[in-house]
Amino acid sequence: MATDTYGVGYNSNTIEGRYNQYARNRELFLERGRECTQYTIPTLIPEEGHSATSRYYTPFQGIGARGVNNLASKLLLTLLPPNAPFFRFSIDNFILKDMEGDENLKTEIDRGLVEVEKAVMEDIEISSDRVALFECLKHLIVGGNCLLFVSKEGLRVFPLDRYVCKRDPMGNVLEIITKETININVLPENIREVIYKTNKPEDIGDKTCDLYTCVKRIKNKFEVIQEVKGVEIPESAGSYPVDKTPYMALRMIRVDGENYGRSYCEEYLGDLKSLENLTKAIVEGSSASAKTLFLISPNGTTRARALAQSENGAIIEGNASDVSVLQVSKFADFRVAQETMAKIEQRLSYAFLLNASVIRDSERTTAEEVKMTAEELQASLGGIYGILSQEFQLPFVRRKIAILEKGGRLPKLPKNVVRPKIVTGLEALGRGNDRNRLVQFLQTLAGTLGQETIGQYVNVSEAIVRLATADGIEVKGLIKSPEELQAEVEQQQRQQLEMEQAQAVTSAGENIASNIPPKTVGETLKHMQQS
């Protein structure tokens, strides 16, 4: 028996004991997340012991909440774009070499993989995965950590205060323990009997108990077991391959050697705090300045009661110099605070990709400037795309495929032959840079050497395919193949030849007719009719 930082005893041999032990390492990250949520969305990571009747802090500024929701929406549209696949299946290079001589086989395999991609995307479209992922992304932005459970029913989100995890030095997950509060009546009957025998009635309380789920990596599998009141539930035991586990412990920003990640808001916490304090000062100062008070000289002839009870436009006795209005006279101070707020808001707008707030307010702002600003902001998320593609997108696709294969809705794909490849996020940023370089190269070539140089030296078909690929457009059936182009050229040549032959025949007939005398022509026609 050991004791944690709060003086609560725990048994490290039980799942609950290990949870309490790991929770000590999590506390620093949890406190930091709660500090960030105070200036963004206070209900996201509430204080310990909160309930439905808890009162939450209301921030004086709303740019934190607006920025979190905006950034989460942009990440959601990038990670799971609607009506568009975010992954492609790629075939092993050695297998591709074996199929080089058989184009029909390669085409058939590509067609089958496209059907599998459509089936996976259709399952995602009809599910509520995006709703849960949006909540998860907000937790990642504010708290830096979140746990996703992917089942056939959909996604489930575990905030940082409901799970602990342990990683190896490379960042791979070794153990995850979740904590849930459930009604004891949902447990199997044999487990309920053991709990009632091993625990006092007052320990069970209002028939709710904490359910602990342990997910531990053993070699190439994750072993799962659940525990209630120190009693393991045999029916919950199971195992998953490492690459198909339903438990995904996500991080926003990876820090080497730490079990948990850092949040996006933590990097801008100073600006959020400063903006909150300045906004609070200006709001409270403005409220004080808006209060109107009339001062009456105690030695004057004007009566305060007569002034207070008089109606608008009334005539009363008094001296105007006896009456004055109380003013705060803090306009200059408020102006300095307002200018500082504007600079902080602009910095936060860049950080949270609030494009409309960072566009230069000018009549000469061009569409190209707006586009370049948006691309610059999007490129700043390259590191976040990188970690989310490896820790969420790839495991999510593998898990979805495993669920569909187990349900008989997908054929079993050959292992180590066909692999999913992410085509959004960081990959899309790379394709966008390739597109910009290609367009710039073609423009430079045309402007320096002339338009005819492109048609003479550049493979136009390949350039068109690369531009379409960079924009994520499927070229199959859209761009004409070399065979189709060759057939069109041959058809045009045949039509041109037929037109030339027809013109030659017509021209020859006209020449013959023009060289025969009219009388001879008539006789010739008559002879032709008789014959």
Predicted features and spans:
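C-terminal anchoring/interaction modules
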Residues: 1-28, 295-531
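Extended, helix-rich architectural segments
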Residues: 1-194
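Charged, low-complexity surface segments at secondary-structure and domain boundaries
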Residues: 4-5, 57-60, 91-110, 117-125, ...
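Structured, contiguous alpha/beta core segments that scaffold functional sites
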Residues: 11, 20, 142, 150-310
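Long, contiguous amphipathic alpha-helices that act as assembly "spine/axial" helices in icosahedral shell
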Residues: 34-39, 68, 110-152, 260-295, ...
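Short, mixed-charge, low-aromatic patches
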Residues: 69-79, 88-95, 103-106, 225-234, ...
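Short, hydrophobic/amphipathic alpha-helical patches that form generic packing surfaces
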Residues: 74-82, 269-285, 443, 462-469
